Amino acid sequence: MYLKKFLMTIAAALCMLPLSAINPQNSKMKELNVKKVSVTNIPVESVPALLDEEKVAFQPVNTVNWAAFPYTPDVEFRIAHTEDAILLHFKVREASVRAVAGHDNGPVWEDACVEFFSVPAGDGVYYNMECNCAGTLLIGAGAGRGNRQHAPQEVLDKVQRWASLGREALKKE
């Protein structure tokens, strides 16, 4: 079994309010209070140590959204924010990994990936960020699944990413 641990720092102020998520299995809201940390220009590879120092706890991700895909890897994340960035740290354990999408805004959803959703303005427009285990990123924004627009490369280039498996696509087996 591989341990994959990847981390991405979202270098934009997307959401400074407490985050909430609905668990469709039991329709209960889970509220997370996102801690503000006072740092600037932190190297992305230093984020796990910073979150350790700030005692930011990991939260489990244990909801299966699609009955057709019942497999659930062991996933946990932690989140904090600075004045101008959201810091995300994901740890994922699963039986096998895949990272074939080798360029941003590619089909990372076909790889081993995690997602982060945010509605920063409360206006119904949400941001969907998907990152595969090699740090390849897809960012879309829109009011629904069908009409999201992908972020331009100059925005994607501002997102700092680090992956414990490295940043190169993993070859298909």
Protein language model annotation of sequence segments:
Residues N26-E173:
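Structural preference for beta-rich elements and adjacent junctions enriched in aromatics
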